[in-house]
Structure formats: structure tokens, C-alpha cells
């Protein structure tokens, strides 16, 4: 549950947030019947790790309790992370996307359009839930304070368990999905591929720094890191590796686990190839390769706008976990890839090509 002290304030500044989400019958506590619920609920509580990945979202608890009260209308403004990710939001997302009473979503890619001067990675949205509505949702998308698109559509499509926020991307997604190819995510490791993410204790989120050196010794292997306020290459004993020992002597590609902020116009995944006898910190994910040539061809694919476009459909924060690659199809990596080649393979129209080109790195020379 949520810590009561976070939401009970001094007299005169009393907060009803705790009562609303914890009382079995909050209507009795408030001495009122709820016909319309409108709100901007608390977004998260900190668990010792600040405002980043360790901040536990709680806004979903207010939405769930509001729906349970069965008013006629609910409208709340919340972070948009729940569309495709967010810590502990999987069940909430599943319920929301299956709820046919979701009549409208107004999605702001940049949260500062609603809250000037405030950064909320992934943007914010407000929704209209209507007890008497049953149908597809009308999705409004805003960029730079302007309405960019509006579409009445399902919240979920076959083969996905997330909300694809960009209306104009739906037909492109369907066209690519029709090829029924394996997902690129199957090639990408899970978090912390070599087991270096060790914390002081279950309640203390401070990291235990791996014992690595900057000079090579006889029994050491290469150690790629991107944390502790710097990045580079160190050396570490193979004995310090806690899992996936079989990956140490493979040729592999490393990709960062955190990239940008969820902004398709600037976020860029930059892969790099590392030779065998190597490992990395938990700030990277690993793509195993059978040869140097295959690794080069995979990198050529990752560097395309096409690839980044499909990642963008699931990546709305800085997190670039294995899951964000789920909608990206695998290719034949006996050959290299370019955007032109990919657009032709999937039969994209010129309008669809222009959409991708303008969404992903539009200012690229």
C-alpha cells in the first residue's frame, strides 16, 4: 500500500488522497456520491531512489478506485508512461486498454504543453471515461501545443499488449506486422546481462560498484561501462561475472539501456561491436552475433530510421529495455540494410515514408 504519511498533512492542509485510494467506501468518508470525478492525482512516491526509475507510480491507484466507484464520467490527467511501460503498470495497462468505456484520450507528447517548465518523460495525457459509452476511443495527439492528429480507433491491436500512441503510424504498423516475422527483441538480452546490478540491500538502492581496473592483467577480460559519471573500457576478472558466462567469448553488439527521453526526433540508439573475451555493466544490453560480418549488418539495421520508428512506438521514456524492440522485425543479416531497402521491402507509400522521415531525426543532414 501507499505510505499514509505521504498524503496526510497538517490541519488546514488536509489531503484526501490517502482516504480516496484506501477506504473501501470513500463515498462515505467524503459524505457524497460521485457522479463525475475529475482530477490530477499524485503521480509517484519515492522509494529512496529519487524521481527516476525507482520512483513507484501511484496515479493508477486513483484511476482504478475512481472506476470502481462507477461514476458517470471520469477525467484525469496522468503521465503517458502507462501506454507502453512504467514500473508496476502492466496489469493497469491491460485493464485500461481493454476498457471499452474509454471514450477519449488527449495525448501530449511534451508534458510542458500542459505544465510549463516541468519535465515528465513520456509526456502526459488526460482521458474521458464514460460509464455509458461502449466502443472505440477517439485519440487526440498534440505536439508543440497543436493538435496534430485525431483518430477513432481501438486502444489495442492484435499482436500487441501496449497502446501505440501515434495515430499516423497505425497503418504502417499493420503493413509491417502482416509479414509475420520474428521479433528483433528475441536477439536482445534482458536487463543486466552479466549480473553486475548489485544493491547494498533490498531497501537500500545504492549500487555496489564492481571491482574493475583500468589496466589489463593476465586473467582479466574487457569490461565496458557507462556509469559512475563516465564511460569507457576497464578490465575485470571473469570470476566477477555473475551470469551469462557463455556470452563472454562471443562477438556481440552493445546497445545502451537508457537513450534520450522518448523523443523520436532526437533519441538515437548507437550500437557498437565488441570482440570476444568481454562483458559490460548493466547500463548496456547485449545482442549476440555469430560473426563480425553479421554484427556489422545488424548495426546497419539498427542505425536506420525505419528501425527507430518501430522502437518509438513502444519507447516513450528514456528506457530502452528489451521490450521496446518487440515491434521491430528481424531481417536476413547476411546482408546490410538501409532505409530505402526497407521501405521497398514493406511496400510503404511515399506518404508513409515521409511520415517516418519527418518523425525520426527530422533535422538530420
Where are these regions (language model features)?
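SAM-dependent methyltransferase catalytic region
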Residues: 1-104, 110, 114, 123, ...
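Hydrophobic alpha-helical membrane-insertion segments
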Residues: 49, 265, 356-358
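Flexible loop/turn segments at secondary-structure boundaries
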Residues: 45-46, 83-84, 261-264, 363
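C-terminal substrate-recognition regions of SAM-dependent nucleic acid methyltransferases
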Residues: 28, 32, 111-281, 288-350
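Short, amphipathic C-terminal "tail helix"
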Residues: 351, 355-365
Amino acid at each position: 500500500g501507499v505510505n499514509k504519511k505521504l498524503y496526510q498533512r497538517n490541519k488546514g492542509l488536509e489531503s484526501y488522497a490517502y482516504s480516496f485510494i484506501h477506504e473501501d467506501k470513500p463515498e462515505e468518508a467524503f459524505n457524497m456520491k460521485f457522479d463525475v470525478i475529475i482530477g490530477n492525482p499524485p503521480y509517484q512516491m519515492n522509494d529512496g531512489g529519487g524521481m527516476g526509475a525507482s520512483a513507484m507510480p501511484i496515479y493508477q491507484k486513483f484511476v482504478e478506485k475512481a472506476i470502481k466507484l462507477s461514476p458517470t464520467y471520469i477525467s484525469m490527467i496522468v503521465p503517458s508512461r502507462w501506454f507502453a511501460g512504467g514500473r508496476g503498470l502492466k496489469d493497469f495497462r491491460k485493464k485500461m486498454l481493454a476498457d471499452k468505456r474509454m471514450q477519449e484520450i488527449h495525448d501530449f507528447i511534451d508534458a510542458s504543453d500542459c505544465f510549463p517548465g516541468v519535465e515528465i518523460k513520456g509526456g502526459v495525457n488526460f482521458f474521458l471515461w464514460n460509464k455509458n459509452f461502449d466502443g472505440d476511443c477517439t485519440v487526440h495527439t498534440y505536439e508543440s501545443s497543436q493538435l496534430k492528429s485525431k483518430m477513432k480507433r481501438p486502444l489495442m491491436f492484435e499482436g500487441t499488449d501496449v497502446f501505440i500512441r501515434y495515430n499516423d503510424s497505425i497503418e504502417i504498423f499493420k503493413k509491417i506486422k502482416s509479414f509475420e516475422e520474428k521479433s528483433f527483441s528475441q536477439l536482445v538480452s534482458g536487463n543486466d546481462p552479466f549480473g553486475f546490478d548489485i544493491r547494498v540491500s533490498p531497501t537500500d538502492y545504492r549500487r555496489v560498484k564492481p571491482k574493475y581496473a583500468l589496466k589489463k592483467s593476465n586473467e582479466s577480460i574487457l569490461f565496458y561501462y557507462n556509469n559512475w559519471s563516465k564511460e569507457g573500457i576497464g578490465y575485470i576478472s571473469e570470476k566477477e561475472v555473475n551470469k551469462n558466462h557463455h556470452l563472454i567469448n562471443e562477438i556481440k553488439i552493445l546497445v545502451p539501456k537508457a537513450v534520450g527521453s522518448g523523443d523520436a526526433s532526437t533519441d538515437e540508439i548507437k550500437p557498437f561491436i565488441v570482440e570476444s573475451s568481454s562483458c559490460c555493466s548493466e547500463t548496456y544490453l547485449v545482442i549476440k552475433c555469430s560473426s563480425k560480418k553479421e554484427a556489422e549488418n545488424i548495426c546497419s539495421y539498427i542505425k536506420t530510421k525505419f528501425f527507430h520508428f518501430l522502437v518509438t512506438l513502444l519507447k516513450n521514456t528514456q528506457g530502452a529495455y528489451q521490450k521496446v524492440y518487440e515491434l521491430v522485425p528481424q531481417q536476413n543479416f547476411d546482408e546490410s540494410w538501409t532505409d530505402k531497402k526497407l521501405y521497398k521491402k514493406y511496400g510503404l507509400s511515399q506518404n508513409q515514408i515521409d511520415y517516418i522521415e519527418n518523425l525520426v531525426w527530422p533535422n538530420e543532414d
